[in-house]
Amino acid sequence: MPLIIPKNLPAYDELQQENVFVMHQERAMSQHIRPLRILILNLMPTKIVTETQLARLLANSPLQVQVTFLQTATHSTTHTAPEHMKAFYKTFDEIRNERFDGMIITGAPIEDLDYEAVDYWDELCRIMDYTKENVYSTIHLCWGALAGLYYHFGIPKVHLDKKMFGVFEHHVTRPSNPLVRGFDEVFYAPHSRWAGLDRAAIDACGDLRILAESDTAGPMLLSTESGRQIFVIGHPEYDKYTLDKEYKRDVKAGKPINIPCNYYPEDDPARDPLFRWRAHGYLLYTNWLNYYVYQDTPYDLTHLEALEK
């Protein structure tokens, strides 16, 4: 089954050209299937790029998936046209009485700020609190994962002297967990961040399980025992050239930035980068939709039970 998105969403045409199975609302209704309802809080400045990246991965499933995009009301984007936001995004007040099978909270390039200094932090806390009663399983990505771990479990972030930037080798630590079913024992994932996690605080937290980690980049995939809260410290949704664009953007702006590790052949930015994480990016989201959303969510979302810690 396909991903259900508005026909005029920019990602629709791009994904169709890639032969990704997407469907507009009118066609989906004719199938008489209850789609999985996925809410995406898009905190990235590059809204359309992130929409396309996540839609691409969510569409790689036999399940019918309907996406709702969410924006913060307390912070307005300056990188995306207001017309786009008005056409495709809702605010928390508009959806707070709805329930969803799953949710994705994206990252944001604001690791240098204390959480309480983020202008939409209070609103984000209300949204994360909302997920505990109104969403079955929530994936938190990169900064969204750091913020979620801090809000739900008090895990502090650690500022890095050098940006964790590149594609790093990871190993699966709990191969029996359904979220990493089918993963190779060693796999690659991209990172692009100025902050990490306090490993001692994670180990001291009895509610969290590390499912995959890197000797260089640290814990990459964490989950609660129930799988209702998942934290991805990285960017498996990134496409082939995302790190390339970030690197060349920062070089052009004169910012201190190293060549992304393990990305360009022979570390030569003039050469085409290696795309080594695509399969596991798809597999992560397919496993999430199948094992933690589809198989466990009640057909009638009004019967959704609140999260118990």
What spans do the regions from the language model cover?
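Amide-donor transfer/coupling interface in amidating biosynthetic enzymes
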Residues: 1-71, 89, 95, 99, ...
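Short, glycine/acidic-enriched capping/hinge loops at junctions between secondary-structure elements
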Residues: 50-53, 79-82, 115-116
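N-terminal beta-loop-helix "entrance" segment that forms/cooperates
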Residues: 73-86
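Feature marks short, surface-exposed loop/turn motifs that line or immediately flank catalytic pockets
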Residues: 73-76, 109-111, 238-240
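Cysteine-nucleophile active-site neighborhood
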Residues: 105-174
